[in-house]
Regions:
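Short beta-strand-to-loop junctions in surface cap/lid or active-site-entrance loops
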Residues: 4-15
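The serine-hydrolase catalytic nucleophile loop
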Residues: 23-36, 190
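Short beta-strand immediately N-terminal to the catalytic nucleophile in serine-hydrolase-like folds
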Residues: 87-89, 114
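Short beta-strand element of the alpha/beta-hydrolase
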Residues: 14-22
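Conserved alpha/beta-hydrolase
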Residues: 36-58
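Gly/Ala-rich beta-loop-alpha elbow adjacent to hydrolase catalytic centers
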Residues: 89-97
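The alpha/beta-hydrolase serine catalytic core
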Residues: 107-209, 213-244
Length: 244
């Protein structure tokens, strides 16, 4: 890694909770800050950070790829979290958490997905959009969450296609909680059901939130997220206690 990443690390007990934002997002979102506040009050270790080219981290956004952001996650695990970690991935962050768990199977002990979007370079683009990306190298879409359009590059799209996961079993044996809103217009909730079916873990729960949109940032949504994190931590720590 030849760029510096901005991050906030809260020391505490237990596995480090690591929040992974979505595409073109950063570590100052509602969910990241709500989890950090909970972690501080509970004395739990917590880490949030910006991918390269996002937020306050170095790099140009247009130069980034999915594999590069995966490597940013791994760098945070190797250099900051260091010990066991529970990854909390929002949208694209849910894809990155799966790739990180694949690369660090002994370190990543639990997963929480929020509208997880693995393989979205496949199902999230029309055939015309894919052809446009291949021909022109970049595609801009209207951004429903801000004034500037959302940029996708051919390099990012190609990197995503090279790192697809949903073609067979997804190897992970720790506890997993998947949250998804039934009113999500960006990532259809059935993708979380598909992921739940492909995960090899026997401890997978999918929670469908009535009226929940893609961001799941309402007060009740955040409370549900905290409960999901608490549930995963409890499962991890129970499994770590030897039978007597």
């Amino acid at each position: 890694m030849n760029h510096r990443l901005a991050y906030h690390h809260t020391p505490g007990t237990g596995p480090t909770l690591v929040f992974l934002p979505g595409y073109a997002s950063d570590m100052t979102g509602t969910k990241a800050l709500a989890l950090e506040a909970w972690a501080k009050s509970a004395g739990r270790a917590f880490l949030r950070f910006d991918y390269a080219g996002c937020g306050r981290s170095e790099g140009a956004f247009a130069d980034q790829t999915l594999a590069g952001w995966r490597d940013d996650v791994l760098a945070m695990l190797d250099q900051v979290a260091t010990g066991p970690a529970v990854l909390v991935g929002s949208s694209m962050g849910g894809w990155l958490m799966l790739l990180a768990a694949k690369a660090r199977p002994m370190q990543v002990v639990g997963l929480v997905g929020i509208a997880a979007a693995p393989d979205f370079t496949d199902w999230g683009f029309t055939q015309d959009e894919k052809m446009y990306l291949l021909r022109h190298g970049r595609l801009e879409r209207t951004n429903p969450y801000g004034p500037a359009p959302t940029l996708y590059t051919r390099a990012f799209w190609s990197s995503g296609e090279a790192n697809r996961l949903l073609f067979g079993p997804v190897a992970f044996d720790g506890p997993v909680r998947l949250l998804h809103g039934d009113a999500d217009s960006d990532v259809p909730w059935r993708h979380s059901l598909q992921l739940a079916g492909l995960l090899t873990s026997s401890d997978v729960t999918t929670m469908l939130v009535k009226g929940g949109d893609h961001r799941l940032s309402r007060r009740g949504d955040l409370a549900l997220l905290v409960r999901a994190v608490e549930d995963v931590l409890a499962a991890v720590e129970t499994a770590a206690v030897p039978d007597v």
